[in-house]
């Protein structure tokens, strides 16, 4: 951790105390997080009273109404930055959180408000998302519909998870989405480098070649310019180009909170995935995305009227050039904007797109400074760059849709995304000259071997680190064995498997572990405890059962209630006579886990 490491260390120490934590020490969610409403003419203000030792996630606070769309964009009170190893930087609240939901339109009739929120206990237990419903009346009063949180089946908003089971992990600067690719201040250098390299890649597509005459005119406009002057003018031109991209990035960052809420819905995620496929097809040349000819001509005429050699004129040329070339690079730019939008940070968004523009502008600066003779000649290699971006966009489409697709279909799609370009490189490489042919054969061979290996491993149920990374989770069949035992999402299948194990060996207990994707301590247990060799030596992992309650279905809620839990993690030793141990709550290290198990087996 780079910042807040002391706070995070305190958090881990509190989690470590969970070995002595009793389930009775935890408050039910309706007492840990208590919403109070103030209904005004212009909106609804919500104040959450948060019990000591608990905290809430800002990005998990959502308001929905019936009739729909009565509320505008919410504003939040200032929260605290919490750094999490698994989910990145989070904004959380202790003690109190205030949210203002303005009305988006006139409200004259009573309506129903559903507040969705989620939080955790500092001791290491996370609660499932809670829905609380209120009837709002026109005279400024309100009434809770029930004393209990709304059930999952009554939700207006059904968050989607990264394993397809239904609930989104805690916000990533936010789950959403996904912690594998997160733009945050802690990963700023790596992310800016990635955006710079992406911009550099875009500069080698045919999209940027219309800008070369403009760059040449910049230098020609100052006939006495040496290389130093030409360099300065080229840099100023690229800064104008970058300004347009930066403003777009800022807008994407400002709308990030809205994108986060929308991206929790399956249909939005799948629509975004379909859009990536369409954009990829444009990179393969099936159709072109461009401004109407009349609009393009207007911007080109305005640019040509500006005289070269003058700083202000050159800067404005750069701005207009971004508008000319922008639609041509729309497919990869659309992905970049969606990626930035998850941050909700205007500064980060602006920095990311500014860096992308700088990468795009490097060859333009080189051309303006040293002349066009250093530019590679146009040819098939430019199409190869476009095709590469097309396959990247297809991979992004699969990545977005992964939580909603069967495991083996995801494996098959990724396999095709490696094998198809491999065959294209191997077939087309034969027509190239010696050096391009060698490069094409090398890349094609790597992709061919990698694709065949990835597909074979996935088809045989052998999940490697790459499979976990790309597919988010191993096959979701009930009872699939892993290094963490047997994972179930269906409670009936879990109970049947546990009953069978206890009947076969009544003298041996089984272990039941409650898990969820949005549970930080569950991730810690998986990463630092359950995968340790000493745990596998002490515990028979064939008798270790995990129930994935990420979806928080009514069946999951009933099972949690049956075992006296408000949320995961919770580990029990269950015996053949029907008795079970007190739960192990929160994160503990391997030695403490083994000690607890030996005491309760």
Curated annotation (Swiss-Prot):
The chain crosses the membrane at residues 192-212, 243-263, 267-287, 311-331, 347-367, 381-401, 407-427, 438-458. Residues 467-601 form the Thioredoxin domain. PROSITE patterns: THIOREDOXIN_2. One of its GO terms (biological process) is cell redox homeostasis. Residues 1-20 form the signal peptide. GO terms for molecular function: electron transfer activity; protein-disulfide reductase [NAD(P)H] activity; protein-disulfide reductase activity. HAMAP family: DbsD. This is Thiol:disulfide interchange protein DsbD.
